[in-house]
């Protein structure tokens, strides 16, 4: 149950573009607080796994696809409070503004040379100001937010599983103890679907 709750999130489309949009939304919010107005450029640095899974993913409700569009949409109009559903709440005019940035070549995607399999960094610039954000290890685990180079949030050296949320399970923990046999044994011998807290599965079915 802890793994399901940790690994499953409601998202607009695939989780990887959602994580990119969330990171960009955090960076965009930081930019606006620093004094930037209309987004001029967006740079995304991500791990190979994120790029592989997000590069050609479509964005529901639009004709757009790819992490460049996800980043632009998040940066221009995203509110990070919506987490991986952030693109659901961006108005049409801001969607079009984001698309114009991509078409003008103002959104760059680069490979981040990092050990993490899940890593997204977004830098947004406007009016001489910058906003920067980093998501790492888990799709909604924001570990860094900066306004003009000054950190307003810095959890880069914090273990997400030790940050106070008992439901968080890191990929390393999953790899350490999860096997096909342990999943089978849990489902056939321990899981009680009528009483165990499996709300995330019910939400997934409803979606």
Enumerate the language-model features and the residues they cover.
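Generic N-terminal amphipathic, Lys/Arg-enriched alpha-helix
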Residues: 1-12, 179-186
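Short, N-terminal intrinsically disordered low-complexity segments that are rich in Pro/Gly
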Residues: 8-17, 190, 194
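Alpha-helical support elements that line or immediately flank enzyme active sites
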Residues: 17-35
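Flexible, glycine/charged-enriched surface loops at secondary-structure junctions
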Residues: 34-41, 82-87, 108-110, 194-198
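A structural-propensity feature for long, helix-poor, extended segments
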Residues: 41-82, 95-107
